[in-house]
Amino acid sequence: MGATASPSRSPLRSDGFDVLYFGAVDWSHTWQRPQQIASRLAAQGRVVYVDPIGLRRLRLSDAPRLVRRLRGNGGLPAAIPEGISLIPSHAATLAAGLRAPSEWTARLVASAVRRALAEARVEHPVIWAGTPSPAVVAALDGLPSRLLVYDCLDAVT
């Protein structure tokens, strides 16, 4: 199991619909709307949560978070709610932060997500996009889906 592609921590349930959730905040960050929504969706079925992919160039202040992500722990809490599986976006975050072409980043993201979905036996999830990241938008074409929900609450600069 590769660290970036493997869902981690919680076994997935299959009694409802499946959701592939592109989060706007790291799962391990302060508990906010994206984690609340994903947790509630997990009560209905399986949720594969993808940590956010960079929206801007990396800054020096991003170094500690980036190091945690690249090491593979991302500052994860001890427990992830039942029904949620997490895909950290290590390589994609670095590529996006360095402004690699979004097509490259999209390939990294789509490949990691396809592997994780296959491991979880998720075939046609509802995709919930919580960020307008160019890499996420570009990756959508390469992913199977039943429905796309675009849910961006905040202005992203």
Predicted segment positions?
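Short beta-strand/turn micro-motifs composed of small residues
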Residues: 23, 51, 129-131, 152
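N-terminal subdomain of nucleotide-sugar transferases
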Residues: 2-71
